[in-house]
Every structure is written in structure tokens, then in C-alpha cells.
Amino acid sequence: MNIIQQLEAEQAATIEAKRTLPEFSPGDTLRVNVRVTEGNRTRVQAYEGVCIARSGGSINESFTVRKISYGEGVERVFPVYSPLVESVEVVRRGKVRRAKLYYLRDRRGKSARIVENTGTRARKLNDSERAALAEEKARLEAEKVAAAQALAAEKAAAEAAEKAAAAEAEAAKAAEGSAE
């Protein structure tokens, strides 16, 4: 493995550690959450459409999502490892026999529809994704609970220290009063 491939693999691993993308292919309907910066404000925008192509490899991999917005076809290319892509959610699995669905550009209405894939592989992928999402939610919930408990313990310790300091101050005052 040469140096460039090694660096690309390291970069891909660090990005995948931060967020994981589900397994998807052309024909699947995706909801891509993208970070958009307008002026000095940043927000997350959902872009939902059909994945019509995946191209490239390693760190240069990208996918094209097509949607119809107000009667106009809009295509957007997203790099898989872009930091602007917050998350990708598979809304529906499509059953197609091509890797590039560019023919959808010329189609309108029913002829542009993609049949939903209800095969066992798609079902397994959906189940595994649901399990992974549930696991992620449980992990985040556990982190929230642990943070809340740590905050409560910190507050209790601060209150106990405050009470101890107040008791010491009273004892000191009482000692001064009895010494007079």
C-alpha cells in the first residue's frame, strides 16, 4: 500500500468513527442531512430523493441524489466523506437493474417510479439498520443519563461542601463568642 492510499484510509477511518453511513445503492430513496451555512448561521437541511449513482472509491467516493422540486428535476452530488454531510437515512429500498439510473432524467410520472425492493436482503439490511439506530439511540440516552447523574452528584457535592463551610463558619463564630 503506497503512502497516498494509506493516508486516504486513515482519513476515511477517522470520518467513519465520527459518523456511520448506512449501506445503500442506486435506486434507494435517501434523506441526506446536510450542514448549510447562510451568512454566520449554520443549520441542517434535509435533502430527500432517489440515489441515481454512486461513483469513485475510497476517500473520493460520492453519490448523486435526484429529486423533483416544484416540477423541476434537481440533482445534487454528495461526497461520502464530506464533513458537511451530517447523516444519511434510507427511506426506502429500490429494486433496479442498473448501477447508473441516468435514464430517470428523461422520465416523468409513473415511468420514473422505482419499485420497492421487498426481498430478504433488503429486509435484512433494514432490520440491521433499525437495530443499529436503536443501539445508537440507547447509547446516546445512556450518555445523557450518565451526564445527568454526574451533574446531580456534582451539585450534591457542592451543596455538601457549602453546608460544611457554613457549619465551620458557625463553629468558628461560636468559638469566638465563647472565647470573649
UniProtKB/Swiss-Prot annotation:
- Name of protein: Large ribosomal subunit protein bL19
Q: Does the keyword Ribonucleoprotein apply?
A: yes
Record gene name: rplS
Do the record's keywords include Ribonucleoprotein? yes
Quote the InterPro entries the UniProt record gives: Ribosomal_bL19 (IPR001857), Ribosomal_bL19_CS (IPR018257), Ribosomal_bL19_sf (IPR038657), Translation_prot_SH3-like_sf (IPR008991)
Give any GO molecular function from the UniProt entry.
structural constituent of ribosome
UniProt xrefs under PANTHER family: LARGE RIBOSOMAL SUBUNIT PROTEIN BL19M, RIBOSOMAL PROTEIN L19
Q: Fetch the NCBIfam families from UniProt.
A: rplS_bact
Q: What HAMAP family is this protein classified in? A: Ribosomal_bL19
Instruction: List the source organism.
Output: Allorhizobium ampelinum (strain ATCC BAA-846 / DSM 112012 / S4)
